[in-house]
């Protein structure tokens, strides 16, 4: 009679652990998809609006645009950081060439790295502390006129109208 009681308690303990653990999996960073938002780029030809996925958690920033096979010209991914710091990126498991636009805390472009090599493990670093990185399909930074000093507007930078 002792064994059924122990087995019952063990089963109850396992169920309790699973009940406590499963909601964390369902709502953890790894399970969430990036939210989509808009940015406005002040270009020489006028304001351009782009749709961007927001990568604002460690898990979303780590995954980035990995495993994607295409990125529309009117979209990108905006990596947001709590504090300005030197940022290092790479192209591991990223199948499409990208332009990386490093952004200061006020939303101005610090520098642009163009034509990154898909799946490369080379480190792509910002030359100065930045608060965000905008990734676009390769060639789009030039098409949009993104260069040092260009303003990118988004509520994160406190400069959205």
PLM features: residue spans?
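Sec/Tat signal peptide C-region and signal peptidase I cleavage site
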Residues: 24-28
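Compact, glycine-rich, soluble single-domain proteins
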Residues: 29-161
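A general, composition-driven signal for non-globular sequence regions
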Residues: 1-3, 21, 42, 55
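Bacterial N-terminal signal peptides that target proteins for export
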Residues: 2-13
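Bacterial N-terminal signal peptides
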Residues: 12-23
């Amino acid at each position: 009679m002792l064994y059924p009681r122990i087995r019952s308690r063990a089963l109850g303990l396992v169920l309790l652990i699973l009940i406590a653990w499963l909601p964390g999996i369902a709502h953890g960073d790894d399970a969430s998809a990036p939210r989509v938002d808009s940015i406005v780029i002040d270009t020489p030809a006028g304001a351009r609006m782009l749709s961007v996925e927001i990568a604002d958690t460690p898990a979303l920033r780590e995954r980035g645009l990995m495993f994607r096979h295409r990125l529309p010209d009117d979209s990108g991914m905006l990596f947001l950081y709590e504090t300005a710091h030197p940022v290092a990126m790479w192209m591991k498991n990223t199948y499409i060439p990208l332009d990386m636009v490093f952004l200061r805390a006020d939303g101005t472009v610090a520098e642009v790295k163009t034509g990154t090599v898909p799946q490369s493990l080379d480190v792509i670093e910002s030359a100065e502390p930045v608060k965000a990185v905008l990734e676009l399909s390769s060639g789009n930074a030039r098409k949009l006129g993104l260069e040092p000093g260009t303003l990118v507007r988004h509520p994160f930078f406190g400069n959205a109208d």
